[in-house]
């Protein structure tokens, strides 16, 4: 299905990662496959908000018994799970997870990010400023692309 197929997220480094949507057990990879996963809330049709980023050496078993999925579903309104697999090396999984957490700033990863630091607050403020800048949306809506000063 096109609507629940693949989505690309960008980490703090600017690197893009292409994730696959997982809606049921049958679409999950085989047991023993490592990777990265994201809990997501779908706002409107194509506006996805990442809520939690994690890594696992066995992504199937981790997602089927994840302790934070209930909280993500009931309190944050999570609707989907996206996975990036296979990533065999633990060091690569750790590096990608950290890059995505710093770039996406998901609310359920706040304790792991150290969001109380002034640098994190400044990054979040800059992100919100870009998000609410109407001129940056003109390119998406068919108008002229915004000029940055």
Task: Identify the meaning behind each predicted range.
Residues 1-51, 55-149:
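Boundary/linker segments flanking structured domains
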